[in-house]
Regions:
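Acidic, glycine-rich flexible loop/linker segments
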Residues: 144-145, 151, 155-161, 165, ...
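Short, small-residue-biased leader/transition segments that mark boundaries at the very start
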Residues: 2-3
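Terminal amphipathic helices with adjacent charged low-complexity linkers/tails
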Residues: 61-63, 76-96, 129-172, 261-289, ...
Length: 544
């Protein structure tokens, strides 16, 4: 090369588009079949430093070579309240960059389209394959050409080094009042006193073993972070500086809480729990918890197929190392209650909704979606996909929603669409809702979510199960409604099970067997309905 040769490289104009960070492994559980992507508007420094709460996406790697599938496991809209851009000449006293507030439209929109999310994920897999190890990458989108670029790639240094033969789990035994929540980093629990700092220069005030609470962190904070037992920040995502350093130090952290520095105070005793899935929770007081460690290579093999019961999608990846034969029960209503949070009819009949507070919250939750019903379908499908992905291709049995009317009423907008029942336990629940005009439109959204999960995302290991089906005639009606919504038993390998939890399911077992591919025994309901004993009655507990 001649000494006068000059390399010319294009500047990626992410200042007029977006940028972020990407990992080819799940940063919290070490699950190696997912890609984690964070994204924000403008230059990437804000994401790296944790100065903004970015969008977050998760993608299932094994399906990325199938162009017809969209294996996006999770999409979370971040606040993205500011963006970093290039400063004009003479602005900012010589600084080449500056932060400006984002517009309302930017805050309410995802930075990346589904196609761009998948494109980045494919880049991650290619880079990981090239280097032969999990990778930590930074990316940027050029606002002029619309092209995506990888601007940095380095080895992931935490999860890839963890001993995969041991499984350590934390469980809260009793906790105080929930004070606030954010994104969890790690899976541990810590207790102690709060030390609230606004600047790394306050290092002399920090007490060893305290819980560090601050707005955000940068490299100047590392000496303090090393002395903390846990870390809580107002801002940042799972790929921010605070999250990365906490992970490397083995500390539980909760980032992106929004207002920890306003709600918590010096000397306050709190419990930091990252053991409950994606959302870390700060509880008041010193809670009791237990830690269990299992050497997986010492677990003996069994002749019987052993499957897990799971409800929380966010916690599914924590258990991926277990030698499970699949998921024996995934409760859809848990995903609706904790993920979707909205009554389906409050979305299909939004214009009829009279609760203005509920409408305002629904508007907030459905930001970024062209149709409100898409929010329900996508959120439900993605929540269930995180369970189905963990042990794919082993089966995942998903039970359709089994709320009672009083439980449906607690969903956003639900009270307007649910009748009052004296005994919801044996009232309008399970199969009887699915074909009734009072809920049929809601069940259609559930079916659309299952269809998306199987056909568009690729999780053909999902088996659907119908709860509380009282008669063969009711079974026929439910199967017909499912068929009308694109879920036909036997088509494309589609299997449908039924809960055996009513005496009629046992008495008419042969008739039910003609209509379904399998049974799952619901011992609680079957016992109480056979004996006529309320399972929640303390007085009759000895008879149950």
């Amino acid at each position: 090369v001649c000494s006068s040769d000059l390399g010319v490289q294009m500047m990626v104009r992410s200042d007029i588009s977006g940028s972020g960070v990407m990992f080819s492994i799940d940063t919290e559980s070490g699950f190696d079949k997912t890609v984690l992507i964070n994204a924000a508007w403008g230059l990437g420094e804000n994401v790296v430093q944790g100065a903004v709460d970015p969008d977050e996406y998760q993608v299932y790697k094994p399906f990325l070579d199938k162009p017809k599938l969209t294996p996006i496991l999770a999409k979370s809209l971040g606040a993205k309240e500011k963006k970093m851009i290039y400063a004009r000449a003479g602005h900012g006293h010589g600084s080449p960059i500056r932060n400006v507030p984002t517009s309302k439209a930017e805050r309410e929109a995802f930075v990346l389209s589904d196609a761009e999310i998948l494109e980045l994920a494919r880049y991650a897999v290619t880079i990981e394959t090239h280097y032969g190890q999990p990778m930590d990458m930074e990316w940027a989108k050029d606002g002029e050409s619309g092209l995506l670029y990888i601007v940095q790639a380095r080895p992931e240094t935490v999860q890839s080094r963890i001993d995969t033969h041991a499984l350590k789990s934390y469980r809260l035994k009793k906790a105080g009042v929930k004070l606030l929540e954010g994104l969890s980093v790690g899976e541990a629990i810590a207790t102690g006193e709060v030390c609230l700092l606004h600047s790394a220069a306050e290092i002399e005030r920090f007490v060893d073993g305290a819980i560090l609470v601050t707005s955000t962190t940068d490299p100047d904070w590392v000496p303090i972070m090393k002395r903390a037992s846990a870390i809580i920040t107002d801002h940042g995502g799972r790929t921010s500086h605070a999250a990365i350093v906490s992970r490397e130090l083995g500390l539980p952290a909760i980032v992106g809480t929004g207002n920890a520095t306003h709600l918590l105070h010096d000397g306050q005793e709190v419990t930091v729990s990252c053991a409950e899935g994606d959302h870390g929770i700060v509880y008041e007081g010193i809670a009791e918890f237990e830690v269990e460690e299992v050497e997986l290579h010492e677990v003996p093999p069994t002749k019987t197929r052993v499957m897990l019961n799971l409800a929380n999608p966010a916690a599914a990846a924590r258990w991926w190392r277990l030698p499970s034969d699949g998921v024996g029960l995934a409760r859809m209503e848990f995903v609706i209650n904790n993920g979707v949070r909205v009554h389906p009819l409050a979305l299909t009949r939004y214009d009829q909704l009279t609760d203005e507070a509920a409408k305002a919250e629904i508007d907030r939750l459905t930001r970024g979606y062209a149709r409100r019903t898409d929010y329900f379908v996508d959120t439900l499908a993605m929540g269930l996909s995180r369970i189905a992905a963990t042990w794919y291709p082993n089966p995942t049995i998903v039970r359709m929603s089994d709320f009672k009317t009083n439980e449906y009423a607690e969903l956003l907008g639900g009270r307007q669409f649910e009748p009052h029942e004296e005994n919801p336990m044996i009232g309008w629940r399970g199969a009887s809702r699915y074909y009734a005009e009072g809920y049929k439109a809601g069940f259609a959204l559930e079916c659309q979510a299952i269809r998306k999960l199987r056909d568009e995302m690729g999780f053909d290991n999902v088996i659907v199960m119908i709860p509380f089906c009282r008669s063969p005639d009711e079974a026929d009606r439910v199967l017909e409604v499912m068929r009308e919504n694109g879920l036909e038993r036997g088509k494309g390998g589609m299997q449908v099970y039924v809960m055996c939890e009513i005496p009629s399911n046992v008495v008419l077992a042969e008739e039910f067997a003609k209509r379904f591919d399998g049974f799952s025994i619901g011992s609680n309901d079957l016992t109480q309905l056979t004996l006529g004993v309320d399972r929640d009655s303390g007085t009759l507990a000895g008879l149950f």
